[in-house]
């Protein structure tokens, strides 16, 4: 039988395989001296595909060559034989009808099955009947079907249960590689992840809600890749501590109270509301229209998971407040002399309201001269200065409203001739004046002594603080413009005559008194 011209079953030989075979056979050129080798194209064959056992360096002077299945030349394992001299093909006992033998020694297998995998022997007989053999091996792999993920626990509980996921491939698992991914990221062994030998089974220890997935297992062999459908775990958890929104806890009468409660839970939690510890509604939201101050109190959201048996609560205190009324500002005197004191009082009927002070429509910046009462209702300025002149207001507020008082303008009376010097500057001036007077007095004494003849004259330099009876140079203490006497320096110049006999009566000494006055206003 001439195998090279044998007809193939319809649809069994892909055109791509035949074209590849033709290309390989056309490019083959025999060599006379090289060793015969055989190449399986491809070496890893997908089931139901073709494989070509391509011979290299086939000798030219051959009487015949034959292919055998296995590493043998037993007659019952012969597939086909070719005789070059007669260009004839013959089939053997192992021929399946899917093989084609070529004159260059190559053998084409069509529609490969798993049973075809193994070793094949080419037996060559030369013209002198000497026989040589060459062998080749190829592997056949199944086309992988889509795998499927199964779980040993369909409803694991967070923190309590572990789960094993198994990738079922429906083919021989020994020749398959398994890869796992979660949320598109590759998984490997870790603290809570364990993989079986071969990676076919993935175990999650002490599952959490973050282990939900989805999971995908991927199967690989040398000829194909396939992936499972995404698989997600139904992890039971919760409820977490509920959150009540919105965050507002103060409302004014006439508004609507609308509260919503949420707690993470699987399955979804059951919700209950209690007002002042009394059951009110079994819903996730609570709505009370047109509230009054009687609606103030504690609002409790109670949640329960019927599967885990866990419950959680959150309490929110709601206060309904009346808007504040306008405060009234009063003052001891709106026209104040500089360095006097003034007291402003903010009057309000709203107990517990917050009080703030404003100066020229801006928040008042307190100085060391300003003091506030414990509840901020009284502002005292002592002493008051000209920069304190302006408009004052008080502002009261509660969490739902704010009101400002009437405006009071403070006028400050001050002496325009006053420079407004500090106490330190005044003290410096006084010291300077006293020192200047003393210097002038000393200079006058020196000049007078020289003019009177040097050391013959005596000078009496004294300092007194004359009484008001003798030297009442300052205004009366009762004067509105009181002036304080600081010091008086009294210079007494006693002119001495030359010494005279003791019998002669001494004439009175001429005395001159000079006053220098330094005053502090």
Curated annotation (Swiss-Prot):
Ig-like V-type domain mediates trans-homophilic cell adhesion through homodimerization and this active process is regulated by tyrosine kinase, PTPN11 and PTPN6. Ig-like C2-type and/or cytoplasmic domains mediate cis-dimer/oligomer. The lineage of its organism: Eukaryota, Metazoa, Chordata, Craniata, Vertebrata. The gene is Ceacam1. Residues 457-466 have a biased composition (Basic and acidic residues). GO terms for molecular function: bile acid transmembrane transporter activity; calmodulin binding; granulocyte colony-stimulating factor receptor binding; identical protein binding; protein dimerization activity; protein homodimerization activity; protein tyrosine kinase binding; Toll-like receptor binding. Glycans are attached at residues 71, 89, 104, 148, 152, 199, 206, 210, 226, 258, 290, 294, 304, 317, 333, 375. The modification Phosphoserine is found at residue 503. Its main location: membrane. SMART domains: IG, IGc2. Disruption phenotype: Knockout mice exhibit impairment of insulin clearance and hyperinsulinemia, which cause insulin resistance; develop insulin resistance primarily in liver. Display normal white blood cell, red blood cell, hemoglobin and platelet. On the other hand, mice have a high number of neutrophils. Display also increased thrombus growth, and enhanced susceptibility to type I collagen induced pulmonary thromboembolism. Spontaneously develop systemic neutrophilia. Residues 147-234, 239-319, 323-411 form the Ig-like C2-type domain. Changing residue 518 to A: Impairs interaction with PTPN11 and PTPN6. Doesn't affect phosphorylation. It is found in: Cell projection, Microvillus membrane; Apical cell membrane. The modification Phosphotyrosine is found at residues 488, 515. Pfam families: Ig_2, Ig_3, V-set. GO terms for biological process: bile acid and bile salt transport; blood vessel development; calcium-independent cell-cell adhesion via plasma membrane cell-adhesion molecules; CD4-positive, alpha-beta T cell activation; CD8-positive, alpha-beta T cell activation; cell-cell junction organization; cellular response to insulin stimulus; common myeloid progenitor cell proliferation. Residues 455-521 are annotated as: Disordered. InterPro entries: CEA_cell_adhesion, Ig-like_dom, Ig-like_dom_sf, Ig-like_fold, Ig_sub, Ig_sub2, Ig_V-set. This is Cell adhesion molecule CEACAM1. The chain crosses the membrane at residues 429-447. (Microbial infection) Interacts with MHV S1 spike glycoprotein. Monomer. Oligomer. Heterodimer. Homodimer. Cis-dimer/oligomer (via Ig-like C2-type and/or via cytoplasmic domains); induced by trans-homophilic cell adhesion through an allosteric mechanism transmitted by the Ig-like V-type domain, and is regulated by intracellular calcium and calmodulin. Interacts (via cytoplasmic domain) with calmodulin in a calcium dependent manner; reduces homophilic cell adhesion through dissociation of dimer. It comes from the Eukaryota.
């Amino acid at each position: 039988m001439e195998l090279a011209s044998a007809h193939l079953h319809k649809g069994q030989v892909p055109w791509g395989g035949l074209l590849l075979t033709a290309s390989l056979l056309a490019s083959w050129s025999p060599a006379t001296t090289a060793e015969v080798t055989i190449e399986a194209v491809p070496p890893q064959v997908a089931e139901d595909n073709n494989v070509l056992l391509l011979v290299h360096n086939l000798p030219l002077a051959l009487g015949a060559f034959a292919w055998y299945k296995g590493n043998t030349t037993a007659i019952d394992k012969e597939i086909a034989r070719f005789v070059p001299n007669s260009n004839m093909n013959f089939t053997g006992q192992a021929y399946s009808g899917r093989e084609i033998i070529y004159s260059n020694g190559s053998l084409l297998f069509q529609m490969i099955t798993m049973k075809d995998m193994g070793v094949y022997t080419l037996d060559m007989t030369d013209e002198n009947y000497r026989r040589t053999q060459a062998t080749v091996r190829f592997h056949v792999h199944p086309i992988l079907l889509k795998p499927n993920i199964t779980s040993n626990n369909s409803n694991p509980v967070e923190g309590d249960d572990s789960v094993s996921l198994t990738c079922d491939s429906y083919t021989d698992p020994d020749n398959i590689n398994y890869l796992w991914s979660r949320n598109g990221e590759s998984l490997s062994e870790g603290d809570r992840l364990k993989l079986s030998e071969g990676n076919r089974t993935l175990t999650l220890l002490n599952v959490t809600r973050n282990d939900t997935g989805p999971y995908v297992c991927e199967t690989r062999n040398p000829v194909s890749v396939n992936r499972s459908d995404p698989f997600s775990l139904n992890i039971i958890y919760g409820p977490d501590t509920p959150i009540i929104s919105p965050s507002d806890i103060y409302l004014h009468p006439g508004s609507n109270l609308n509260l919503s409660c949420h707690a993470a839970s699987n399955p979804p939690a059951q919700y209950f509301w209690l007002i002042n510890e009394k059951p009110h509604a079994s819903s996730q939201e609570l709505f009370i229209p047109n509230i009054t101050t009687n609606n103030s109190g504690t609002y409790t959201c109670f949640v329960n998971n019927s599967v885990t048996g866990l419950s959680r609560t959150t309490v929110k205190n709601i206060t309904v407040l009346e808007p504040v009324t306008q405060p009234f500002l009063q003052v001891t005197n709106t026209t104040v002399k500089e360095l006097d004191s003034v007291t402003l009082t903010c009057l309000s009927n709203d107990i517990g309201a917050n009080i703030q002070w404003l100066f020229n429509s801006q928040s008042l910046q307190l100085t060391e001269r300003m003091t506030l009462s414990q509840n901020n209702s009284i502002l005292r300025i002592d002493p008051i200065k000209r920069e304190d002149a302006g408009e004052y207001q008080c502002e009261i507020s509660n969490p739902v409203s704010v009101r400002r008082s009437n405006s009071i303008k403070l006028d400050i009376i001050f002496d325009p001739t006053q420079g407004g010097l500090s106490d330190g500057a005044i003290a410096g001036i006084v010291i300077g004046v006293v020192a200047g007077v003393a210097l002038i007095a000393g200079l006058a004494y020196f000049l007078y002594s020289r003019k009177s003849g040097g050391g013959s004259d005596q000078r009496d330099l004294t300092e007194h603080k004359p009484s008001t009876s003798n030297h009442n140079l300052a205004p009366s203490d009762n004067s509105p413009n009181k002036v304080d006497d600081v010091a008086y320096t009294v210079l007494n110049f006693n002119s001495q005559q030359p010494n005279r006999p003791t019998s002669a009566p001494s004439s009175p000494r001429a005395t001159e008194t000079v006053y220098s006055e330094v005053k502090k206003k």
